[in-house]
Amino acid sequence: MNTDTPTFEAQQVVRLRRGDLIRRLLQRDKTPLAILLTAAVVGTVTGLIGVAFEKAVTWVQNLRIGALVQTADYAILVWPLAFILSALLAMVGYFLVRKFAPEAGGSGIPEIEGALEELRPVRWWRVLPVKFVGGMGTLGAGMVLGREGPTVQIGGNIGRMVLDLFRMRSAEARHTLLATGAAAGLSAAFNAPLAGILFIIEEMRPQFRYNLISIKAVFTGVIMSSIVFRIFNGEAPIIEVGKLSNAPVNTLWLYLILGMIFGCVGPLFNHLVLRTQDMFQRFHGGEIKKWVLMGGAIGGLCGILGLIEPEAAGGGFNLIPIAAAGNYSVGLLLFIFIARVLTTLLCFSSGAPGGIFAPMLALGTLLGTAFGMAAAACFPQYHLEAGTFAIAGMGALLAASVRAPLTGIVLVLEMTDNYQLILPMIITCLGATLLAQFMGGKPLYSTILARTLAKQDAEQAAKSQRSVAGENT
């Protein structure tokens, strides 16, 4: 008798086990797989829209600058034209925001944080077109704003749009896809996938519900967004400052001093942003006409400023490599720094659709380079390179203002491809964050969200009082 031949009973047992395994697989909860697949869709769409937004803003800027170049020989025409073109473009952005989607004003990142806690609405059918077209207007006008805020808010709203289109009802999917879109948006803006992931984990840590599914979804969305960005824009770093030399160990104390300087500047900058917001609110009082005219005036002034001192206008990406290379004197760097602080306050605090990441990176570069050049003059024996302090300063102001040192470190290293500077970056950003916290500074985005929620509660209370008064009469 052949003992190797399986008996009929043994074959039956194998078939039953196989059928039971297949049945368990079919009955298994497919929610995690569905979330990961939709996260890939969110990341891909966010990457495509993010690239399209960048190209659209560049196209508008080129049209505006081209019109000015054609009239450059006629001073009587070029100055009024610079004001009018930028004013009209800015007014488009302000009008769309105020008329159709007030939550699309400003950076948009606090709105995503509020939505993650289900405290703010996500009206993607309004926010997506308003933020895209409005951002084209304000950024195309040459205002001192960045595109990362719009892409983060656009990404979060794409996450909610995909959720609605696929009719996914679970709270886990709603929260996860919103966070995935926001992370993919930051990655699409800066070609910085790891910074996009850290931004959600660190900056949105009070709101983000960390679990295996949510973090895998964020990873998936960021990967797809980064792939889309690199297909269209290549793999070069977004800011070309060249390969800088490493910082010698005996110079690291200088980076701690630089961090302490930014630890003082960060809370002061946040305070000025909030006070300027209050000033604008008192001026327009919520009236759309005043608000749009005010925005047009600010946009027009940025257009004029772009003719007088181009470095003081725009997001700042073109300024960063020039300043980091040491092409300006310390005095000129400080002058441009002060000018850009003022223009950043005017543009961002007025509620224009646009971010503040890029302007803060430029401000950090200016102050960091000025410090580096001064340190090189005071300590010639160290053979210091001002560019290394510029890189450290880029992340330090972001860390002190937003209170996200890890995001600031990784974002700058990914954007400049200077990973060898990670140690001075850590020292500078940690020093800036600790001193900012010691001085009582609050994270900028969290503070803006708290003010928005307080305003929302006040409006709801006033509405309730009016309805009660109407019933009594």
Curated annotation (Swiss-Prot):
Residues 109-116, 177-189, 193-201, 387-401, 402-404, 405-416, 417-421 dip into the membrane without crossing it. Residues 70-76, 142-147, 233-252, 310-329, 377-386 are periplasmic. Its main location: membrane. Keywords: Antiport, Cell inner membrane, Cell membrane, Chloride, Ion transport, Membrane, Transmembrane, Transmembrane helix, Transport. It catalyses: 2 chloride(in) + H(+)(out) = 2 chloride(out) + H(+)(in). Homodimer. Belongs to the chloride channel (TC 2.A.49) family. ClcA subfamily. This is H(+)/Cl(-) exchange transporter ClcA. It comes from Citrobacter koseri (strain ATCC BAA-895 / CDC 4225-83 / SGSC4696).
